[in-house]
Design a protein with these regions (language model features):
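A contiguous catalytic/ligand-binding core that recognizes phosphate-bearing ligands
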Residues: 49-55
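DNA major-groove recognition helix of helix-turn-helix
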Residues: 62, 73, 91
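Short, well-ordered loop/turn sites that connect or cap secondary structure elements
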Residues: 55, 61-62, 81
Length: 149
């Protein structure tokens, strides 16, 4: 289960372990916190918004500086988005053929916790995702049990 989640989000073992440790420190259910942190990563938000075809492509868009958060360039894929933040593509990225294709052809529905705007070039984090809104087929309790040994 851990490997399934880790590969789905494209994280190294160290990144995943750190995420678990922070989720464990926070109040609430550790497994849900962990999935929420995974979903709120900037590369995942770009993917969920339909700006990229895959999480790897979303990670590359972020790494290459094509993404703004609240008007400022952010090139760290692990950046954790907060409620109310606006994630948008920079002007140069909006003209890229691959980005246009992703938005037009894939036409992916964004989850309920994201609000689309500006022809798919912008997305607002409306609320923090809850477990029901996260569609990754992972049993997070097994991950928590593995790491809590």
């Amino acid at each position: 289960e851990k490997q399934k989640a880790r590969f789905s989000y494209g994280l190294t073992e160290r990144q995943f372990r750190r995420l678990y440790e922070e989720a464990n420190r926070r109040q609430g259910v550790t497994g849900e916190n962990m999935l929420r942190f995974l979903e709120l990563r900037l590369d995942n938000v770009v993917y969920r918004a339909g700006m990229a075809a895959t999480r790897a492509q979303a990670r590359q868009l972020v790494n290459h500086g094509h993404v703004d958060v609240n008007g400022s360039r952010v090139d760290i894929p692990s950046y954790r988005c907060k409620k109310g933040e606006v994630v948008s593509l920079r002007a140069k990225a909006r003209k890229m053929v691959v980005v246009q294709w992703n938005i037009d052809v894939l036409d992916r529905q964004s989850p309920a916790w994201l609000e689309m705007g500006d022809n798919g070039h912008e997305v607002t984090v409306r609320e923090l995702p809850v477990r029901d809104q996260i569609d990754i087929p992972v049993r997070e309790q097994l991950i928590v049990e593995l790491y809590s040994k």
